[in-house]
């Protein structure tokens, strides 16, 4: 290492390599040169000023006399700027940073000259062609250099050597002329990167070998990138001379200099060289295992100082392609990591708690809700409302989503590990640095996100009180106070009027009104919750639905006290938007689209996840100054679900589809899941808050204390009749699947096979469902074959008739019955001899034996089954007469009159029998219990309603049904009646999984029955969360009915697999169908 004078520092870089002039020949750094500020009339003075300004940008601060001399000598020349720069570097000294530069040691010239670039004069010539320099930079000279990492590669010899290479000998890396094949298609005419990057002997400059393709791709680009340097050292060649094709191990040390951190360095995103440079930087960081730090992290594992060549799996072989294929799917574990990263970035548990004033908000928030309220107020920049110090956790502001924070690794370069000492200008360099590998920018200062978005996504898990949390925000900030204060003394803005229509083209700003868009089923619940928390504080809510408001714009703009909240539904928004698309200008002057709201809140915001639907487009057209999305599932099917939410909030620049595709969609479709998720996590971190029931606060306490939840899977056995029907449809389904597999067209028969599966599921519930359609299955919509089924009575054969209807003694039995019970009065106070229940009710649930004794239907059937299992004769508990299944009667309401008819058990659903048995037990143990029964088949709910009404009298049990066929008023009445506690009656709510699976608060019930399973376990979890959520005070017990040895049992296994491995988040619809095909194969395996 060469020494300078006493007290001088050793230097590391050559003078010609430290100065990185502009390179117009590269599209990487093209920017538009700007002249001096202000207008100058004298053309000569303007040219001189421009010449000196651009000269300073390349050379830094110089004395005025030197600059004047360069202008006098070269100002009039066409390429004068190039000549002035060349003259300066050939014979002049610069000031400032050059002083430190001249102190650097030049003895290590060869070791630092591992990058073979073109001569400075040639670079300057290319940079100045056509006029002005193309880089703007305050400092051109390297002021410091830091070690970034090391990697080891297996190089392949391309030239023989006369003697072995010495251990530790230095190698040069040379980039030869020519262009590699960037398309990925290797050919003889277009060789790869490894043909253009070679190792050379540092002493003789003789070529020795080539590098692996992936390493060559990195070096080919970065060798000509200012601020990145490499040093190559030979560390293994088996102590023999090299022949062509031999492998030898080379260590690459990578360094970065201050030039890489020059803010003027990055070029334009559309430039090919710029994109290649950024890709090379990404590959370099990946190869060096540079792992980003989470905000607030201090340490990362340091790399070992010594390497074991035999165990180091990071060595890249020149003969093997190193990139590996990514998995073809993403699972729920990755989504959980995504949510976890957003929770960490929000620093939610470090925020102070904000409590709404008790005179304004009637409820007491939980601790995590108070912290969430602070986060929401910060998102809306309502700092004046917050207590001092509330924003300390986010004082510095969130880091820009595209940037990552890294810690400088410990210097384990070859020279340092061998004890070589040197002095470097690193004293003032922070121990962390920041990189945006997508744009190629580097910084030593934390880049702060500068989004102007006011709002965010509250994605708390279902049941944690998102509704109450957002209502607390509305109570705290009901209006735009700053706007109201500034406009109090001003006249309202007058828009331009259309001469033809007389309609203002400027939307008035409703600074005191928040619009909340909800699913129709949740409209009554939101209204009730608003009244409950804001009772008596002066705020009021207006429901905008079914034309109840004649002119919304007048209501919001011209009234002195407009509503604080307007509640409407997605359907209303879509309807009004559709009218606007038909050029109905009156609608734009009256409805939701005629004003700009203060705030818009979307409940169940995932309803707009498909941006191509009318609902999504309509919601996007609404305008406001603050926007919020409430959803427990921001990602449902695809990663692009998030784009619609971001677009709704106008989150720049991510709301632009081209930007989103470049950084999210395209990498995802190319199976680069890690890159796509990395960007998503960074983007969503500042604007998304998610808490789950299992999370704990800063003190280690659970966020919410909920009572226990017990889920019981009850296996149901088919009756003989159901088993016969199931076997018939199963054989048809298996035959269809086997044929499709044999022909290889299973995907083409997708809908037909799903139809077979649907029929099997329907038989498991009730054979009367055959011919109806699953309202949740999008794949079977409008399918013509849905009603193409054989006659059920034909399939049942003799079982379709009552066993006793054709018996010779049945007419006599009916006559004897009518004699014993001549009228309805004789049927009063009937008692079951098995359960000793007096006054069996309703009478339609009574079954009479041949001897004329009455019994509860469920009691008698259980008794017969019990005796059959024992192999004993079934006899009447009263008179000991034989009981035969073919001689049973029941009462049926015919035209308002009860008539005896032969009883048949063949038309009974085993699941319904089990449900009735459980309900009767609940009635006996807790007469006023409230129960929810879930199913995804609306027609099944109809069957259940009829069966339950026949089994339970109205004076002891009330049955309610809630599905998509009810209008808003009917839904409100059903929920109000069900939630009202009765002291003597049991209440049963039959609930459609689609209509009531989300949003509803049914904590009044503590028992639930899920009658049929669904493909996704998440659907059933949502149903359970309607009951097991905040407000529940009792232990929750949930029964899931599964028919054993049926398709339902296999669906249960698929659910278990999804829970353990995760559900697919597919890139497109075709992949979603393929994943369903895999499930189909499992069902018929």
Swiss-Prot record:
A GO cellular component entry from the record: nucleus
InterPro entries for this protein: Helicase_ATP-bd, Helicase_C-like, HIRAN, P-loop_NTPase, SNF2-like_sf, SNF2/RAD54-like_C, SNF2_N, SNF2_RAD54_helicase_TF
Keyword Glycosyltransferase part of the UniProt annotation: no
Disordered: region residues: 92-118
Chain ranges for the short sequence motif DEGH box as given in the UniProt record: 603-606
UniProt-listed PROSITE patterns: HELICASE_ATP_BIND_1, HELICASE_CTER, ZF_RING_1, ZF_RING_2
Binding site for ATP: 460-467
Keyword Protein biosynthesis: no
Listed GO MF terms: ATP binding; ATP-dependent activity, acting on DNA; DNA binding; helicase activity; hydrolase activity, acting on acid anhydrides, in phosphorus-containing anhydrides; zinc ion binding
Subcellular location: Cytoplasm; Nucleus
Zn finger intervals (RING-type): 832-880
Annotated Helicase C-terminal domain residues: 914-1072
EC number: 3.6.4.-
Residue stretches of biased makeup (Basic and acidic residues): 92-104
Intrachain S-S bonds: none
Record's compositionally biased regions (Polar residues): 106-118
Residue span, Helicase ATP-binding domain: 447-652
Family according to the record: Belongs to the SNF2/RAD54 helicase family.
Known role: Probable helicase, member of the UBC2/RAD6 epistasis group. Functions with DNA repair protein RAD18 in error-free postreplication DNA repair. Involved in the maintenance of wild-type rates of instability of simple repetitive sequences such as poly(GT) repeats. Seems to be involved in maintaining a balance which acts in favor of error-prone non-homologous joining during DNA double-strand breaks repairs.
Name of the protein in its database record: DNA repair protein RAD5
Originating organism: Eremothecium gossypii (strain ATCC 10895 / CBS 109.51 / FGSC 9923 / NRRL Y-1056) (Yeast)
